[in-house]
Structures are given as C-alpha cells and as structure tokens.
C-alpha cells in the first residue's frame, strides 16, 4: 500500500507543466512574460510554491491568495481568471470562496464571479476619500440604518461557462460593527445568530450553500465591511479586494485593513494598485514607493512569510496621449521588488509597451478610454500572468 502511494505521489511530482499558451496577437511580448525577482530568489515566493506543492501533490493544506487593486480588480474578470486557472491544476482543491462584498448596496458594480442584491435603506463609503466610517480589507462599507436593510449574496457566477465551478460554504464571518445585530436568514426565513467580537461575527450554517441572506435585528445602525465565506477544510482560495478609482493612498485610509487581513492570512498578495496613482499631473515616485512600503509592512506584520507580487500597470492614455508616468511607476515597482524580495510582472512590457493600448483596443481587448480592458482583454491578461507564475513555479 505504501509503495502504491509513493508511486502515485512520484507521478504527480513529475507531471509536465501546463503548456504555455501561444499569444494570438503580434503586439504581445511573450519574451517578457516572466516573473522578475530583482532582489534575487525570493524566499517568500519559494515558500508559497512549496505550499502549492503540498496542495497539488497530497490534496492537503491551505493556500490563500489576496488580489488588491482598483477597477481592474473590482470588475472581477481578471481575478476570476486567475482563480479558475489555479483550480484547474488539481480537481477538487477549491477552498472557501473567501472575501465578498454587497457592491449593489453601495450602488456600484459587483465582480462577475457572484451577484448581490439589497433591500431597505443603505448608505455607503469608500477609501477614495476620508470617511467617518472605519474601513477594512475591502476598502468599502455599507451602512444599515434600520432592520429593513437586507443583502443577498449568490455565488453562482453571472457569466456562465461550460465547466462551471461551484463554490459552496458553511462558515460565514461578517466583518463590521454597530448596535444592530447581523443575522442570517436560512432558507429565507429561519434565523441564525452568530457569535464574535465587536468587529467580526461568526456563523456556522448547518449545511453547505452557495448563497446567503443577511439581515439585522435590534436598534441603531451597522457598518458592513464585507463577508468571508469559508469551509472547514483546506484548499485553494483567491480573494479579491478592488475599489474603482483606488490608489495606494486610498488603501492607506483603511484603518482596519491589517486587522481584517488576519482572517484571510494570505500566502501571496498580488498588488495591482498603481494605474490611478499616475492619472494626475503630480505623480511622485518617492511618495508612491512610500505608500507601498506601508502597505507591505502591514501585510508582513500579519504574515511575515507572505509572498508579494507586483503586477505592474498597463499602458494607458491620458489627454489623448500615452501616459508619460507609466515608465516611472514601472521603475518604482522594480525597486520595491528588490527592496522586499518580491516578484514583479511587467504588465506594461508584456502587453507591448508605450502606445500598445491602442492596439489592444483595435483587437477588441481594451475599452475606448484606453485605461480599462474588455472582458476578453482581462481574461487575456489573466492568462499571461498565470503563465508567468507557472513558469516560475515549474522552473524552480
């Protein structure tokens, strides 16, 4: 029996790496599609890879990724593409769905991988400007003023695919605070009360589900900063935290960001913040790096062995011309990667460099604003980034 198990494990270890996709577009620089580690081999990235080894070979363990950014992340297509690629590496290794937020109650778009709806009276706050509300890992909050407020979260993706991944959970952590008490309505009617602290309420649902309805009881108000959906066993999970228009300075406004990151405890944080930092006339690379230093310190205080991956930023246009700050930001990313033993993916270079956003637009991959991508474009970016990650993983 032991010999059989050993042979099976050995076969898993020598399986060939997934075939790299050949770029269908001549403007993509496949030769640049690698993870750069300017500071030399990253111990934290190697630790992440070893945890992934354990999960892929034995089916055991817990691997968690957090993707942080602006509208590129809030839209959800890029993050979900990465999530699906990781889960395709081994059947049945999906962990909990992770961090979610009722974006519809805030009057903004929900990531494509789930849907949200709301009832009652809600107000909202984001990290884009100073707010009276405490903000955390999602960078947003919605405030319930009375018991008429309800939200429903459904994990069935709005974008249906042939091989549909189904995410189920039976553990819910509600991130928020207030005098109203959050409750779950099971099957739309039975009340489930949670336990917890001032800033977190934990619920154990007696069955697996892919949707929940959150309501409130009592008097007063409640500030809801997000929910974490999980299972009692391990696996791979990727949580996204994206706020349209958010810059590095925006995320520093989130005073509970570090505290709530303990709930995710990421092994890898992918930072896709930067495109909004370069939209003004006064981009300051030193300030940009200083903001990132503080964000990274907060991550490493939660998990000192957490790997950091800077995705860089894409080519973009401003005032009908190529944004001249992009290359300065790219240089800053490389310097940060060297300073923190992090990895850097040259999104700007891989997509074709200066002016390439116009070519992506012509190919139906970018929007007319030459800042954002189409769904097909975000999927392609996800494919390219995942290929670079897997080349680094299998090329050790």
Predicted stretch roles:
Residues 270-276, 297-330, 346:
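Active-site segments of SGNH/GDSL-like serine hydrolases
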Residues 9-18:
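Hydrophobic h-region of N-terminal signal peptides that target proteins for export
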Residues 74-179, 184-185, 195-290, 372:
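Conserved SGNH/GDSL esterase-like catalytic core that processes O-acyl groups on lipids
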């Amino acid at each position: 029996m032991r010999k059989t198990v050993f042979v099976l494990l050995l076969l898993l270890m020598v399986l060939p790496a997934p075939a790299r996709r050949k770029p269908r577009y001549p403007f993509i620089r496949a030769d640049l599609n690698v993870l750069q580690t300017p500071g030399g081999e990253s111990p934290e990235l190697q630790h992440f890879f070893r945890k992934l080894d354990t999960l892929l070979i034995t089916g055991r363990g817990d691997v968690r990724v957090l993707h942080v950014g602006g509208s590129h992340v809030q839209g959800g297509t890029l993050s979900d593409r990465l999530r699906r690629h990781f889960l395709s590496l081994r059947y049945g290794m999906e962990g909990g769905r992770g961090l979610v937020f009722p974006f519809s109650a805030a009057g903004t778009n929900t990531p494509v991988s789930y849907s949200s709806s709301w009832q009652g009276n809600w107000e909202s706050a984001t990290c884009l400007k100073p707010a009276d509300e405490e903000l955390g890992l999602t960078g947003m909050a919605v405030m319930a003023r009375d018991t008429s407020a309800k939200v429903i979260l459904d994990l069935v993706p709005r974008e249906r695919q042939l091989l549909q991944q189904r995410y189920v959970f039976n553990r819910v952590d509600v991130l928020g605070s207030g005098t109203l008490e959050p409750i779950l309505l099971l099957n739309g009617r039975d009340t489930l009360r949670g336990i917890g602290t001032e800033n977190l309420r934990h619920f154990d649902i007696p069955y697996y589900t892919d949707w929940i309805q959150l309501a409130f009881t009592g008097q007063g108000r409640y500030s809801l900063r997000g929910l974490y959906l999980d299972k009692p066993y391990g696996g791979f999970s990727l949580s996204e935290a994206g706020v349209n228009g958010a810059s590095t300075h925006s995320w520093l406004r989130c005073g509970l960001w570090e505290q709530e990151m303990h709930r995710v405890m990421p092994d890898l944080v992918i930072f896709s913040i930067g495109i909004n930092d370069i939209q003004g006339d006064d981009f300051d690379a030193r300030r940009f790096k200083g903001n990132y230093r503080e964000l990274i310190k907060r991550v490493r205080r939660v998990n000192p062995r957490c790997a950091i991956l800077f995705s860089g930023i894409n080519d973009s246009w401003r005032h009908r011309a190529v944004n001249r700050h992009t290359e300065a930001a790219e240089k800053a990313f490389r310097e940060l990667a060297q300073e923190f033993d992090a990895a850097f993916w040259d999104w700007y270079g891989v997509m074709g460099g200066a002016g390439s956003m116009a070519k992506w637009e012509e190919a139906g991959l970018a929007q007319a604003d030459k800042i954002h991508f189409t769904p097909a474009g975000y999927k392609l970016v996800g494919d390219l980034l995942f290929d670079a990650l897997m080349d680094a993983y299998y090329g050790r």
